[in-house]
Amino acid sequence: MDDRYPALQRAQLRLDFIHANSTTHSFLFGALAELLDNARDAGAERLDVFSVDNEKLQGGFMLCFLDDGCGMSPEEASDIIYFGRSKKRLSTLKFIGQYGNGLKSGSMRIGKDFILFTKKEETMTCVFFSQTFCEEESLSEVVVPMPSWLIRTRESVTDDPQKFAMELSIIYKYSPFKTEAELMQQFDVIYGKCGTLLVIYNLKLLLNGEPELDVKTDKEDILMAGALEDFPARWSFRAYTSVLYFNPWMRIFIQAKRVKTKHLCYCLYRPRKYLYVTSSFKGAFKDEVKKAEEAVKIAESILKEAQIKVNQCDRTSLSSAKDVLQRALEDVEAKQKNLKEKQRELKTARTLSLFYGVNVENRSQAGMFIYSNNRLIKMHEKVGSQLKLKSLLGAGVVGIVNIPLEVMEPSHNKQEFLNVQEYNHLLKVMGQYLVQYCKDTGINNRNLTLFCNEFGYQNDIDVEKPLNSFQYQRRQAMGIPFIIQCDLCLKWRVLPSSTNYQEKEFFDIWICANNPNRLENSCHQVECLPSIPLGTMSTISPSKNEKEKQLRESVIKYQNRLAEQQPQPQFIPVDEITVTSTCLTSAHKENTKTQKIRLLGDDLKHESLSSFELSASRRGQKRNIEETDSDVEYISETKIMKKSMEEKMNSQQQRIPVALPENVKLAERSQRSQIANITTVWRAQPTEGCLKNAQAASWEMKRKQSLNFVEECKVLTEDENTSDSDIILVSDKSNTDVSLKQEKKEIPLLNQEKQELCNDVLAMKRSSSLPSWKSLLNVPMEDVNLSSGHIARVSVSGSCKVASSPASSQSTPVKETVRKLKSKLREILLYFFPEHQLPSELEEPALSCELEQCPEQMNKKLKMCFNQIQNTYMVQYEKKIKRKLQSIIYDSNTRGIHNEISLGQCENKRKISEDKLKNLRIKLALLLQKLQLGGPEGDLEQTDTYLEALLKEDNLLFQNNLNKVTIDARHRLPLEKNEKTSEN
């Protein structure tokens, strides 16, 4: 159906968008203010807002806005129907409107249709914007008829008479004006050579069928129907427009009576001005810098294209290409200059003027009035002490600030600010200056009652208005200057204080010649408003107690943060011990209780006792697949501590640390500590030669960029007497505390190992003729955490002095450990890749003798094996996981699209149901009125409760009315039949 009017202009907007766009105005007067802003931006000196009764239309009247602004030409009028097309943002003048959306959103919030008449120069244009027309004609896109005439001849401007006739026929059918004479009459209402008349009709209704705007209660005002607000500016359009502009100069008439617009800064008692210098509000400046940077990039790309064309063009087109290049260079320079200016503005501090004063006319109407570009955005915003109930500090104080558009940008409906964080910061600052104002003026909690009594307020703080007596009126007039605006020059003049205060009323017509002050009784005189005292914000440094309190809070916060990051001891349970190895030595016995180990050459005799236990604690580390180096570390360290096993089982006594070799880290273990994470035990008293010739052979294969696996151990060494045994205790930083139950579980295990090693002790005693042990056994191991799917790396630290032959140096537990290690590796690979062939290093059934003689070679083989695992198997596994993730993401995106489509369909169904329900409520209200049963005034819940109560009670009147209707209908039928027969 959209192709029925191909010649007419279209607003390039969908019909459903018009309704959605109008809902941005939650505050109804905010929609009306959009239309006032358009008149002010057009330079209008006078604006009339009035209603015209018309019972044929929805709502019963039309709402009209008439201004004497610059008007619009046919070309300019065609721009207003498009969304976001406005030249105001590009202008150097500071217009209120910036988005090109106020006319559509504001008028469509009030009613369904509007018709606009405008005059400029020699033309008259009519713009017909109607939702009713589009709905009746089943048009999904908004079609806008726009006929134009010449002012002198009243003839059509267009050359297409068929289009002109079609536009007029649509206007006659769907507008309140049915003939061309009525249309011309509306142009005649515009009394000047230029101006605009906006007529809004088919007004929006409430649930009770009444219009949202009430023009019947007060014939000189437009009220908001059903409003229960305390502040008049929220329910009276006259009160709202009186404070709508920070610097009012346009005269506003509502229902043919002038609005007493207020220069709010000069209507307060004891006003004071504060200069707030800040660099906090940078949101709008950052957006401007981004736009300038994008413009520079676009200009530079155009310049590059022009340079390429100059290099490739022929001689004939060379001159034109150079001209294009020159223009591109100039454009780049201009854009770069603009970018530098925007960046300079971003760094520049801004100064905001904050005004404060007391509203002595009604102290309950206090709060902050926040303007943006001279337009009111928020009003009666409570800040600081005003937020507290029954607080006297700041009672009756009004704060005013006018924020430039480039500092903080308002929203599209001009009722909020886009940057909520900056707005909240502004309110906080205004609360601080409110306290400073109360200090400067002496209006504090102590003398506030005396101050209020001077203006006629009683002691009760709930009293809003002062007493209406001559004494208090004179006091108010002496404290607050009376300013009035001239109707000719629109300048504000201050009347002298000798004026009769009882007869001081607002005049509908006042000019400068009526001013008793001879210095300002002419329109040629310069406007001179009262000066406002300048206040300063005291910057008193915080007291010593406040500084100490802040420092204490920061220290506590830092300590809590350190406590969260502090590593805690971790206990390795007995069931995780994987390797136990022993090595024996022979030495002489000596029962001296005060024996000390000397490392530099003393002849010592030690008790023959040897046993050590190696414990590998596994720790799951997350493998980083993207790295390319080896992911395995082998760490071998020796940590020794002497302690008596018998004393360990019986009691815990004070221990004395013993000096150890350089590779052993010494620490002191407290008696209160109950850590029992014993990973290696060595019970031996080596001879002097053994200590001199002992060398620790360790190897490790490190990854170049490994970030995860570093295991640090703490060694605690103590010596009590000659019969004590040497114990190596390793505690990890991430371990937890150990209970006594776990300690008891380890003791039987140690005893069992002691019994198993008796034969080895005898064998080592027979081979004690060897000078020293030449090798240090270090066994690399790995354990697997299959539940998480990651390889865990384990470091085993062990140390012993071997004095036997190569055949007996390698014990059976070490071979068993290596076998378990290989089996675990096979389980890992088969878990990830059951279809691949395992490396040959892992397929060998047992270790060869090379491990005994050259452990480095076996370590190289293991490194090659792990490199193959990482470079081959893990890469394949990574690709497989990536494919799975991609498929999952694709499925989730597809489901999301389907969900959005279904959500949109459900939303449309919901809107249709709401419209049906709304129509049903309207019809129900009409039905109840016809049946004389009254009707509920309120929302849907009140309607439901009213109907339920009506159905439950036996309403005789309802039954009687039904009986009367049926009886009357029966009597009418025979009478009509008799009349028809008599006529025949």
From Swiss-Prot:
Residues that, per the record, bind Zn(2+): C486, C489, C512, C523
A molecular-function term among this protein's GO annotations: zinc ion binding
Tell me where it mainly resides: nucleus
Q: Where are the zinc fingers (CW-type)?
A: 477-531
Tell me the SUPFAM superfamilies matching this sequence: ATPase domain of HSP90 chaperone/DNA topoisomerase II/histidine kinase (SSF55874)
Query: Where can this protein be found?
Result: Nucleus
Task: Write down the superkingdom of origin.
Answer: Eukaryota
Which segments does the entry list as coiled coil? 284-353, 737-761, 900-934
Against Pfam families, the record matches this protein to: HATPase_c_3, Morc6_S5, zf-CW
Q: Which GO terms describe its biological process?
A: behavioral fear response; cell differentiation; epigenetic programing of male pronucleus; negative regulation of DNA-templated transcription initiation; regulatory ncRNA-mediated gene silencing; retrotransposition; spermatogenesis; transposable element silencing by heterochromatin formation
Which cysteines form disulfides?
none
Q: What is this protein called?
A: MORC family CW-type zinc finger protein 1
